[in-house]
C-alpha cells in the first residue's frame, strides 16, 4: 500500500512539474495599459443591423514582423487575421453625424494561408488564438462618408499557438484593449461597405 502511495505521489509530482514546465515555456504577449498592442487594417460589410469587420494585424507588439515575408506586406502574407461579427443596437442622427453603437465578438486568428479581401471567409481560415467581447461606437460624417470609431474588447478566451518553434499566448483572460479606426464608407449598396485602419491600445480594467 505504501509503495502504491509513493508511486501515486510521484506520478502526481511529474504531472504538476510537466504542467508547470509547459506553462513556463509559453511566452505571453501581455495586454498592458496604455501600450499600443496591434495595428489593424481591414474592410467591413454591413447588412441591416449586422456588421462584419475583417482584416489583418500589420503590427503586433512582441513580434518584429507580423508577416511571413519581409518584402510583401499585405493580407496575402499576414500572420494574424481577425473577424468581428457585430449587431447594431442604436443609431442616433445629429446634424452631419450618424452615431452607431454595436456589440459583438472579435476573433484573432493565426493565419494558415493567404487571405483575400474579395473573399472575407479567408480571414477566419486559421486557428483562433484570441476571442473577445466587443462594443463599438462609430461616428460617421454623412457629408463625406468618412468615419471614426472607438471600441473596447475584453478577452474571454486565449489559445496557445506556435510560431517559429516558440509557444505564445496573445493577451490574458479578462484584460481589455481599446481600438480606434479611421475609415471611409463606400457607396451605399457597394461591396465592401468600407475600409479602415487603426490601432489597439491596452486599457485599464
Regions from the PLM with identified roles:
Residues 1-11:
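Bacterial N-terminal signal peptides that target proteins for export
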Residues 10-19:
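Bacterial N-terminal signal peptides
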Residues 21-25:
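Sec/Tat signal peptide C-region and signal peptidase I cleavage site
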Residues 26-205:
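Extracytosolic secretory-pathway proteins
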Amino acid at each position: 500500500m505504501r509503495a502504491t502511495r509513493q508511486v501515486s505521489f510521484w506520478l502526481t509530482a511529474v504531472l504538476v512539474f510537466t504542467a508547470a514546465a509547459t506553462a513556463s515555456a509559453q511566452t505571453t504577449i501581455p495586454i498592458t495599459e496604455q501600450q499600443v498592442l496591434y495595428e489593424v487594417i481591414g474592410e467591413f460589410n454591413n447588412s441591416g443591423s449586422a456588421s462584419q469587420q475583417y482584416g489583418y494585424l500589420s503590427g503586433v507588439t512582441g513580434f518584429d514582423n507580423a508577416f511571413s515575408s519581409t518584402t510583401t506586406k499585405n493580407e496575402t502574407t499576414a500572420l494574424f487575421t481577425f473577424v468581428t461579427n457585430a449587431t447594431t443596437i442604436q443609431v442616433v442622427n445629429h446634424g452631419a453625424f450618424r452615431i452607431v453603437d454595436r456589440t459583438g465578438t472579435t476573433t484573432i486568428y493565426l493565419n494558415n494561408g493567404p487571405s483575400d479581401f474579395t473573399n472575407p471567409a479567408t480571414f477566419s481560415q486559421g486557428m483562433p488564438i484570441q476571442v473577445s467581447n466587443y462594443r463599438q461606437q462609430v461616428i460617421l460624417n454623412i457629408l463625406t462618408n468618412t468615419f471614426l470609431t472607438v471600441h473596447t474588447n475584453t478577452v474571454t478566451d486565449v489559445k496557445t499557438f506556435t510560431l517559429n518553434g516558440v509557444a505564445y499566448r496573445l493577451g490574458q483572460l479578462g484584460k481589455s484593449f481599446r481600438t480606434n479606426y479611421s475609415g471611409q464608407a463606400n457607396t451605399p449598396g457597394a461591396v465592401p461597405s468600407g475600409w479602415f485602419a487603426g490601432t489597439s491600445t491596452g486599457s485599464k480594467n
